[in-house]
Amino acid sequence: MAWVPAESAVEELMPRLLPVEPCDLTEGFDPSVPPRTPQEYLRRVQIEAAQCPDVVVAQIDPKKLKRKQSVNISLSGCQPAPEGYSPTLQWQQQQVAHFSTVRQSVHKHRNHWKSQQLDSNVAMPKSEDEEGWKKFCLGERLCAEGATGPSTEESPGIDYVQVGFPPLLSIVSRMNQTTITSVLEYLSNWFGERDFTPELGRWFYALLACLEKPLLPEAHSLIRQLARRCSEVRLLVGSKDDERVPALNLLICLVSRYFDQRDLADEPS
């Protein structure tokens, strides 16, 4: 069996793309100066390639990677429901069936509702306006007061600028998928540091109803984040009869069972 030089073995794995004819450059060839002819250039490339190691291992400092990491993806599931808080399987199945009907209706009548004229006081923010959407959905009063909720003082009329606009079909039908995903992210960020409110619940339900399948990766991550946060807040609710419990259960149910995130589903009570 003939001996095969190491360079030939490498060339079998990395074949030449351009043929290079052998040339005699022994006279006057100086590899330290810029090449003057095509032959000198190709010869210089061959010399530099021969000096490179066959295998290069990058020395990576894990501490630097960890320090510069900007996105944290949690694969953990939802917090288990406290005793007596988890909904029955029948209830979850009923909610999924009703939600499916709502989504079909929204899709069917989207063009109709989109054509309806909005009231003069409805000014929808641009997709990238996070603060604008928070105020639009939750109201300037709630955004200013944090998680304390809107004032219950009676007023002669509803000031939607202060209390937030509800997710009317004439509003959500005007939102494309980019805006829906963005608003879902904005409200999820808000919810991540605050308590659950009816305003949040209504908007989360409407946004999920308008979210198209198959989900984009960003939307997939956001709805899982939403379900996990709902389970965390549910742990802090002092009574199973609290009105927040069925609303939180509903959002967890829709994310896990309608959008097929089964690892987040509640175990039936």
Swiss-Prot record:
GO cellular component, as recorded: cytoplasm; cytosol; Gemini of Cajal bodies; nucleolus; nucleus; SMN complex; SMN-Sm protein complex; spliceosomal complex
UniProt modified residues of type Phosphoserine: 70, 155
Coiled coil feature spans: none
Keywords assigned: Cytoplasm, mRNA processing, mRNA splicing, Nucleus, Phosphoprotein
GO biological process terms held by the UniProt record: spliceosomal complex assembly; spliceosomal snRNP assembly
Location(s) in or outside the cell: Nucleus, Gem; Cytoplasm
Superkingdom in the source lineage: Eukaryota
Signal sequence region: none
Keyword Repeat found: no
Primary subcellular site in the record, as a coarse category: nucleus
Function: The SMN complex catalyzes the assembly of small nuclear ribonucleoproteins (snRNPs), the building blocks of the spliceosome, and thereby plays an important role in the splicing of cellular pre-mRNAs. Most spliceosomal snRNPs contain a common set of Sm proteins SNRPB, SNRPD1, SNRPD2, SNRPD3, SNRPE, SNRPF and SNRPG that assemble in a heptameric protein ring on the Sm site of the small nuclear RNA to form the core snRNP (Sm core).
Quaternary structure, from the entry: Monomer. Part of the core SMN complex that contains SMN1, GEMIN2/SIP1, DDX20/GEMIN3, GEMIN4, GEMIN5, GEMIN6, GEMIN7, GEMIN8 and STRAP/UNRIP. Part of the SMN-Sm complex that contains SMN1, GEMIN2/SIP1, DDX20/GEMIN3, GEMIN4, GEMIN5, GEMIN6, GEMIN7, GEMIN8, STRAP/UNRIP and the Sm proteins SNRPB, SNRPD1, SNRPD2, SNRPD3, SNRPE, SNRPF and SNRPG. Interacts with GEMIN5; the interaction is direct. Interacts (via C-terminus) with SMN1; the interaction is direct. Interacts with SNRPD1; the interaction is direct. Interacts with SNRPD2; the interaction is direct.
Family indicated by similarity: Belongs to the gemin-2 family.
Name by which UniProt lists this protein: Gem-associated protein 2
